[in-house]
Design a protein with these regions (language model features):
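A short, Lys/Arg-rich alpha-helix, primarily the initiator
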Residues: 1-14
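Alpha-helical residues within helix-turn-helix
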Residues: 10, 20-21, 45, 49
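Residue-level detection of the helix-turn-helix DNA-binding "recognition helix"
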Residues: 13, 27, 37-38, 52
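Short alpha-helical DNA-recognition segment
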Residues: 15-34
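DNA major-groove recognition helix of helix-turn-helix/homeodomain DNA-binding modules
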Residues: 43-61
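TPR-adjacent "capping" and linker segments in tetratricopeptide-repeat scaffold/adaptor proteins
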Residues: 58-71, 173, 371-374
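Helix-turn-helix/homeodomain-like alpha-helical modules used for DNA recognition
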Residues: 69-120, 294-298
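Extended amphipathic alpha-helical coiled-coil/heptad-repeat regions
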Residues: 112-398
Length: 406
């Protein structure tokens, strides 16, 4: 919903109009103050008269502009927060600047100009309009932006001394690097079964993420804390963390239920807790998955699940999806995908699959190559399968070194 009172107040400040000047002949000064402070039971006709005098606009146009411009503004904010190029969006925003001043995103033009060339790693010592910064600081909550992130940016931009800016950003960047290293360490502890240690380490990592306003790291830590809480049979604690995920989800643009079901399901599947994995993963079946890498990770878990459950029709459907996806990739990725689908097919069809030489070779190949092509997490998913293969092959020494290196 458009915040009319805030819109009127900001425009009045920008146009340097007094309350008495703006409300003359329309309403009393106290009524205008109530409008600006969003008091209820104000006649919409009075609000429209104020808007028309202020900006030659009415409520309907204000709402229409808000809805029309929202996707562009959100995309700019996303790129800014990921430190990506925004020049093409800035050009569109410049074209629309008149309309930005007539929408819920009245401040957006100022934000984009202030941060149009802002680079976290190359900070220019340029003069910033203090009045603009004050205005943004006062009403940053007006837009659908991440307040904590912009609060930190504004705080550092205010520094007159460039060295201070660089020092603080280097501190944040170093903190981010340290934070991510600790996060991955805690994630490994979790998958190795050291749940208490993973939980305590992730809590410290989360505190660092909050200090540095690293939204992505905050998100990962909260999810891991929720998983740890479930493993520790603390359901109340896990609910608290998943509720925090909901608070971050709108910015991250993730479907929170999808994220939770996928991560819990994949974790249970990796731990070979098949019934719990099914409880979470089967909720993802209703989605349609296009042939993309992000879809592959979900389809792979579903295919793996139904292979374990020996549900042939569903397992074959997802195995065929992987084969079709593989045909669209370059040889390096395609080869790995083919090994994955072949291993699932053998596991599905042969009761004594562990003794199948091709299955053994495929699993070893997947484990050895999946980290460089996909991720460390994907490699870890296949550790239990590799362990089964090495045990049946009596390759105890190699298995020992894998655990030692981890």
């Amino acid at each position: 919903m458009v915040n009319y009172g805030k819109y009127i107040k900001i425009n009045r400040y920008l146009q340097k109009k007094s309350i008495s000047e703006l409300c003359d002949g329309i309403c009393t000064p106290s009524t205008l103050s109530k409008i600006e402070n969003n008091k209820s039971n104000i006649n919409p006709k009075i609000i429209n008269q104020i808007l028309e005098r202020l900006s030659n606009i009415n409520i309907d146009i204000l709402e229409a502009n808000t809805n029309r411009l929202k996707p562009l503004t959100e995309l700019f904010i996303q790129r800014l927060m990921l430190n990506l190029d925004r020049s093409d969006l800035m050009a569109k925003i410049e074209e629309e600047q008149y309309n930005y001043l007539h929408s819920e995103y009245i401040l957006f033009l100022y934000i984009t100009k202030l941060f149009s060339n802002f680079d976290l790693y190359h900070i220019n010592n340029k003069d910033i309009d203090e009045e603009t910064i004050d205005l943004i600081s006062e009403v940053i909550e007006f837009g659908d932006f991440n307040e904590l992130y912009f609060y930190n940016l504004l705080k550092i931009i205010r520094y007159k001394n460039t060295n201070n800016r660089l020092r603080d950003f280097k501190k944040i960047i170093d903190g981010d690097r340290y934070g991510w290293l600790n996060y991955f360490y805690c994630d490994t502890l979790f998958h190795n079964g050291n749940i208490n240690e993973a939980y305590m380490g992730t809590k410290k990592c989360y505190e660092l993420a909050c200090e540095n306003c690293n939204i992505n790291l905050m998100y990962g830590c909260i999810l891991l804390l929720g998983l740890c809480s479930l493993e520790l049979s603390n359901s109340n604690e896990s609910v608290k963390y998943f509720k925090k995920l909901e608070n971050l989800a709108p910015f991250m643009k993730y479907d929170i239920n999808f994220v939770i079901n996928y991560n819990l399901g994949a974790t249970m599947l990796e731990k070979k807790n098949i019934e719990k994995a099914k409880y979470y993963l089967e909720a993802l079946e209703a989605n349609k998955y296009n042939y993309s890498l992000s879809s592959f990770f979900v389809v792979h878990k579903l295919g793996y699940l139904y292979t374990e459950l020996k549900e042939y029709e569903k397992a074959n459907y997802y195995i065929n999806w992987i084969n079709e996806f593989a045909s669209k990739q370059d040889s390096k990725i395609s080869n790995l995908l083919k090994k994955i689908s072949d291993s699932l097919t053998i596991k599905l069809k042969e009761p004594n699959y562990l003794c199948n030489k091709k299955y053994q070779e495929d699993i070893e190949f997947i484990f050895q190559n999946s980290q460089s092509i996909f991720s460390h997490g994907f490699q870890k998913f296949y550790l239990a399968d590799l362990e089964e293969v090495y045990l049946i092959q009596r390759r105890y020494k190699e298995l020992y070194y894998i655990y030692k290196n981890r």
